[in-house]
Amino acid sequence: MTQIHPTALVDPKAELASDVTVGPFSIVGPNVRIGSGTRVGSHTTVEGYTTIGEGNTIGPYASVGGVPQDMKYRNEPTRLEIGDRNTIREFTTIHTGTVQDRGLTSLGNDNWIMAYVHIAHDCTVGNHTVFSSNAQIAGHVEVGDWAILGGMSGVHQFVRIGAHAMLGGASALVQDVPPFVIAASDKSGNKATPHGVNVEGLRRRGFDAGQIAALRQAYKLLYKSDLSFDEARNEITALLGQSDAGTAAPLRAFVDFLAATQRGIVR
């Protein structure tokens, strides 16, 4: 049965599955839905039009579903959707969306969100990501599946981080990171720059040698040649056309990401 601590304040209109746990001094608002097996720690606030799936763990002092930190916001009923089996640690803040975008902030499944992380309005976070402590993403940011954000990293609004990409700790990211690429600060400052393909991460996730070699070749065309961005993208597209079925999928993801960039890519 639902375990709600006597000091917790759960609005009668909130919808909680029968085995949800809510810790001491926590607050759950009227428009909140929480799925089976989710545990809400102590001193935590879950508010707004927020839907949380099954098997999540939300740590103490987290603020989930708060209003956007956007001066254009006028109390519209925007939403936050969180999937299943996510770990959201203490003092994390995740805000709802704005009507200037989709009106939705979303977090997928199996994400590991460490302490003091901020996920702003209208962000889209995929599955199996890792946000190290104090990672901060501004509004409208997209984070692909299996991406890793290092501690104390900061991401500018509207930036995209591709699947399986990695952002180093204490890095400032102002442009897109293509999938499978490592971006990190260098000796000249904290602005993130490209540092190769995330080879170790790809091996751990089952990518074979041929796929990794193809991605390395694409990376060299984009970053290690004298080609312009458009020329490099065309060469990578040609490489895709020559690839077998096994190597085509990651190359297609790489090419499609480049084609969709609005802010440009890290350089």
Swiss-Prot record:
Pfam families: Acetyltransf_11, Hexapep
Gene3D superfamilies: Hexapeptide repeat proteins (2.160.10.10), Udp N-acetylglucosamine O-acyltransferase, C-terminal domain (1.20.1180.10)
PROSITE patterns recorded: HEXAPEP_TRANSFERASES (PS00101)
GO cellular component: cytoplasm; membrane
Reaction equations catalysed: a (3R)-hydroxyacyl-[ACP] + UDP-N-acetyl-alpha-D-glucosamine = a UDP-3-O-[(3R)-3-hydroxyacyl]-N-acetyl-alpha-D-glucosamine + holo-[ACP]
Residues forming coiled coils: none
InterPro entries: Acetyltransf_C (IPR029098), Acetyltransf_C_sf (IPR037157), Hexapep (IPR001451), Hexapep_transf_CS (IPR018357), Lipid_A_LpxA (IPR010137), Trimer_LpxA-like_sf (IPR011004)
Biological processes, Gene Ontology terms: lipid A biosynthetic process
Chain's role: Involved in the biosynthesis of lipid A, a phosphorylated glycolipid that anchors the lipopolysaccharide to the outer membrane of the cell.
HAMAP family linked: LpxA
Subunit structure: Homotrimer.
Protein's name according to its UniProt entry: Acyl-[acyl-carrier-protein]--UDP-N-acetylglucosamine O-acyltransferase
Organism field: Cupriavidus necator (strain ATCC 17699 / DSM 428 / KCTC 22496 / NCIMB 10442 / H16 / Stanier 337)
Lineage, broadest ranks: Bacteria, Pseudomonadati, Pseudomonadota, Betaproteobacteria, Burkholderiales
